[in-house]
């Protein structure tokens, strides 16, 4: 193990609003089949106003069979409500990590898990299996919440060398299923599996939905499209799964619903960046709808900050999870919009 990348806040090089690059390019030397190479990177987030996204570039050589990444940080719960350190993580491949670059996206788990792996054959839920292309891969750290005195972090990258396994074979869910004729169909468009922060696997989600009397569900894992590649392995022929994503920005969440399998929508922007319309337009161009999720949730970074005129949004969610005061506020707001003809 090489621990040659100890970093602190002074080594964070600003690369634009809400973005920082963590240190210099880290390089792994080529190795023979069967070899394993590991490097560890350390740093710290010491301020609540640290940039939203920190990029750790890793140069991956040829003949790598699998990439494994693990990370650690200190939650430091203050005991004062939603007030503790949370650091998210994800990765992009050499196709790039610029805003909206779906070709480079290879997965995101937020703060839901502490490690992941990617190979040509398989990947941890939340991540995309596929070729381990040589070049610069970029690990993304997202300090979702930082409380004083902050937190140190550690990222460990392991490369396993060897022949690639067989290619991953996608199995998306059918885009339509036989109905029962005119009438009401019952479903839920806002659900999470183990592909983000949910507790249920895809088969468990289908079972729970059937037991609840649902005819369809919307797959809406946070910030990743990975579940859409495998729903077809678990979905009965008479049950509809609608692909989607909960686009989890730092200025509120919105559902991209009705997407073609494999479609990924970026979330690395805030209300002041003037990017929402760009990505809701992308959803509609793909045949989907953009829905403001839990718009009156009071939690920072979840609270809707894109404006209550809902410019660029097709619908709003008025009930999310157990009924609470913010659901009541959403219903009243929705009713006032209907009454005013908005």
Model-derived features: positions:
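N-terminal signal peptide c-region/cleavage motif recognized by signal peptidases
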Residues: 29-30
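Solvent-exposed, flexible loop/coil segments flanking beta-strands in beta-rich domains
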Residues: 33-77, 161, 176-178
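Short acidic/polar inter-strand loop motif in beta-rich domains
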Residues: 76-77, 144-149
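Edge beta-strands of jelly-roll/beta-sandwich modules across compartments, strongly enriched
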Residues: 147-158
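A metal-dependent hydrolase metal-coordination microenvironment
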Residues: 172-311, 317-340
């Amino acid at each position: 193990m090489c621990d040659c990348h100890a970093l602190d806040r002074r080594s964070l090089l600003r690369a634009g609003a809400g973005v920082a690059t963590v240190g210099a390019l880290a390089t792994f030397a080529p190795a023979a089949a069967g070899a394993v190479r590991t490097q560890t990177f350390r740093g710290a987030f010491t301020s609540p106003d640290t940039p939203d996204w920190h990029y750790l570039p890793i140069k991956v050589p040829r003949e790598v069979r699998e990439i494994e990444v693990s990370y650690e940080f200190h939650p430091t719960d203050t005991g004062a409500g939603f007030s503790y350190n949370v650091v998210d993580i994800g990765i992009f491949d050499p196709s790039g990590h610029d805003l909206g670059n779906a070709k480079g996206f290879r997965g995101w788990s937020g703060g839901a898990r502490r490690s992941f792996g990617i190979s040509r054959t398989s990947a941890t839920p939340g991540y995309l299996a596929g070729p381990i292309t040589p070049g610069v891969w970029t690990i993304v750290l997202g300090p979702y919440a930082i409380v004083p005195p902050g937190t140190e972090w550690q990222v460990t990258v392991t490369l396993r060398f060897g022949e690639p396994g067989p290619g991953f074979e996608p199995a998306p869910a059918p885009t339509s299923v036989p109905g029962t004729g005119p009438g009401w169909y019952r479903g839920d468009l806002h659900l999470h599996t183990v592909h983000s922060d949910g507790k249920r696997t895809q088969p468990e989600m289908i079972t729970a939905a059937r037991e609840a009397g649902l005819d369809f569900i919307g797959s809406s894992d946070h910030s990743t499209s990975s579940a859409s590649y495998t729903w077809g392995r678990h979905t009965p022929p008479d049950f509809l799964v609608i692909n989607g994503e909960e686009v989890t920005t730092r200025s509120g969440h919105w559902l991209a619903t009705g997407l073609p399998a494999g479609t990924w929508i970026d979330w690395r922007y805030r209300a002041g960046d003037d990017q929402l319309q760009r990505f809701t337009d992308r959803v509609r161009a793909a045949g989907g709808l953009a829905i403001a999720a839990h718009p009156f949730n009071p939690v920072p970074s979840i609270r809707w900050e894109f404006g209550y005129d809902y410019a660029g949004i097709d619908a709003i969610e008025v009930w999310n999870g157990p009924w609470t005061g913010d659901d009541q506020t959403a219903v009243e707001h929705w009713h006032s919009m209907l009454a005013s003809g908005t």
